[in-house]
Amino acid sequence: MSASKILVGCWLGLAVLSVSTVLLGNAGATLALAAGVLLAAFGKAWLITDGFMELRHAPPAWRLLLLGWPLLMAIGVLLTLL
C-alpha cells in the first residue's frame, strides 16, 4: 500500500474518531461514555503515532513510550471518575 493511501486512511480514521468523541461527549455523563471518549482518544493517539509519525517500523521502546503515555493518562482519568 502506498504511503499516500495510508495517510488518507489515517486521516479518515481520525475524522471518524473525532466525530465519535463529540457525539459520545454530548450523549451524557456516565462512566461508560467517558470510557468510550477515552478509548477514542487512545485510538487517535495510536493512529497519529503509527500512521502520521510512521513509528510502526520504529524500535519497540519508542512505540511503548509514545503509546504508553496516553494509555496511562486515560487510566488516570478513569480512576479519578470512580
Swiss-Prot record:
The chain crosses the membrane at residues 1-21, 22-42, 62-82. This is Uncharacterized 8.5 kDa protein in nirQ 3'region. Its main location: membrane. Pfam families: COX4_pro. GO terms for cellular component: plasma membrane. It is found in: Cell membrane. The keyword Nucleotide-binding does not apply. It is a multi-pass membrane protein. Keywords: Cell membrane, Membrane, Transmembrane, Transmembrane helix.
